[in-house]
Amino acid sequence: MFSHLPFDCVLLLLLLLLTRSSEVEYRAEVGQNAYLPCFYTPAAPGNLVPVCWGKGACPVFECGNVVLRTDERDVNYWTSRYWLNGDFRKGDVSLTIENVTLADSGIYCCRIQIPGIMNDEKFNLKLVIKPAKVTPAPTRQRDFTAAFPRMLTTRGHGPAETQTLGSLPDINLTQISTLANELRDSRLANDLRDSGATIRIGIYIGAGICAGLALALIFGALIFKWYSHSKEKIQNLSLISLANLPPSGLANAVAEGIRSEENIYTIEENVYEVEEPNEYYCYVSSRQQPSQPLGCRFAMP
C-alpha cells in the first residue's frame, strides 16, 4: 500500500502545477488598442519582482515568444506596439497592444516570477480580434439645452412672468468612460488575485498531504524495524538463558533419580541347609552410601 504513495503525490503535484494558470478572454477590434490586465501586490513598496509577457500559453518556466519583460527596477525589454499602461512599480503590469490586427489574436502569458519553488503566478489571457465595424460617422448633435435655457412661464392675474432656470449641467462622457474602465480593471484585478490565492492554497494543501503520507510511511517503517529487533532480542535472551543453566543442577537431578532406584531394594537370602540350620540375612539402608560395606546380621536358633 505504501509503495503507491510517492507516485500518487507526484501525480497530485503535477495536476496542481498544470492547473495553476487561469485563462480569461478579452476582445478588441482591428485598429483599436487591446488591453490585457495583469496585477500583483509587491511585498513592500519598491520591492518589485520580474515579470514577463509572451505570445502563447505559459510554459513550465519563463515565457515563450517574449514581447515584454521587466526586472526588479525597470522595463528591460519590449517590442514595438507592446507597452505597459499602468504603474508597474505598484504591481500594475497590464499589457497594452497598439493598433491591433487579426494576427494579434491568440493567447498571451503574463508570468509574475515570485521567488521560491513553484511560486510563479501564471495568467493565460485570450485575445480575440474582430474586424472593425463600418458605421457612418455620427453627426454632432447640438446641445439645445446649453443654447436655449429652460424657460418657466407662470400665468397669473397680472402679466405673464418668465423665469430662467438656467441650463442643465453638461455630462462629461469621457469621465464616465474612464471611471467605468477603472471599475472594470479593479474588478478583474480582484478576480485574478482571488484565483491565484485559491490555486496557491490548493498547492499548499497537496504538499501538506504528501508530506504527511511520507512521514506516516517513515514512522511505520521505524515501528516495524523496532518490533522485529525486539522480537529477535527476546529470542536471543531465551537461548542465552538455556545455555547458561548450570550443568551440576541437571546432573544432580539425574543422579538423584538413579540413586533412588538403586538404593530402594532389600537383599534377603535364606539358606536352608540340613547340616547348618542357621539363617542369616543382609540389608541395605536407603540412607547408606554405596561405598560403605553391607551390614549383615546373623540369627542363631
Swiss-Prot record:
Pfam family membership, one: V-set
GO-annotated biological processes: adaptive immune response; cellular response to lipopolysaccharide; defense response to Gram-positive bacterium; inflammatory response; innate immune response; macrophage activation involved in immune response; maternal process involved in female pregnancy; natural killer cell tolerance induction
Effect caused by changing residue 272 to E: No effect on TCR-induced NFAT activation (phosphomimetic mutation)
Statement: the UniProt record of this protein carries the keyword Ubl conjugation: yes
Keywords: Adaptive immunity, Cell junction, Cell membrane, Disease variant, Disulfide bond, Glycoprotein, Immunity, Immunoglobulin domain, Inflammatory response, Innate immunity, Lipoprotein, Membrane, Metal-binding, Palmitate, Phosphoprotein, Signal, Transmembrane, Transmembrane helix, Ubl conjugation
Topology feature Extracellular, residues: 22-202
Superkingdom of origin: Eukaryota
Result, substituting residue 82 to C: In SPTCL; results in dysregulated secretion of inflammatory cytokines by macrophages; affects protein folding; decreased localization at the cell membrane
CDD domains documented for this protein: IgV_TIM-3_like
Sequence intervals crossing the membrane: 203-223
Binding site for a 1,2-diacyl-sn-glycero-3-phospho-L-serine: 111, 118
Cytoplasmic side stretches: 224-301
Location of this chain's protein in the cell: Cell membrane; Cell junction
Residues the entry annotates as binding Ca(2+): 116, 119
S-palmitoyl cysteine lipid modification positions: 296
Organs and tissues of expression: Expressed in T-helper type 1 (Th1) lymphocytes. Expressed on regulatory T (Treg) cells after TCR stimulation. Expressed in dendritic cells and natural killer (NK) cells. Expressed in epithelial tissues. Expression is increased on CD4+ and CD8+ T-cells in chronic hepatitis C virus (HCV) infection. In progressive HIV-1 infection, expression is up-regulated on HIV-1-specific CD8 T-cells.
Consequence the record notes for mutating residue 265 to E: No effect on TCR-induced NFAT activation (phosphomimetic mutation)
Entry's Gene Ontology cellular component terms: anchoring junction; cell surface; early endosome; immunological synapse; mediator complex; plasma membrane
Result of altering residue 296 to A: Higher amount of polyubiquitination
Reported function: Cell surface receptor implicated in modulating innate and adaptive immune responses. Generally accepted to have an inhibiting function. Reports on stimulating functions suggest that the activity may be influenced by the cellular context and/or the respective ligand. Regulates macrophage activation. Inhibits T-helper type 1 lymphocyte (Th1)-mediated auto- and alloimmune responses and promotes immunological tolerance. In CD8+ cells attenuates TCR-induced signaling, specifically by blocking NF-kappaB and NFAT promoter activities resulting in the loss of IL-2 secretion.
Record's subunit section: Interacts with HMGB1; impairs HMGB1 binding to B-DNA and likely HMGB1-mediated innate immune response. Interacts with BAG6. Interacts (phosphorylated) with PIK3R1 and PIK3R2. Interacts (not dependent on its phosphorylation status) with FYN. Interacts (in basal state T-cells) with VAV1; AKT1/2, LCP2, ZAP70, SYK, PIK3R1, FYN, SH3BP2 and SH2D2A. Interacts (in activated T-cells) with LCK and PLCG. Interacts with ILF3; this interaction promotes ILF3 ubiquitination and degradation.
Name of this chain's protein: Hepatitis A virus cellular receptor 2
Organism per entry: Homo sapiens
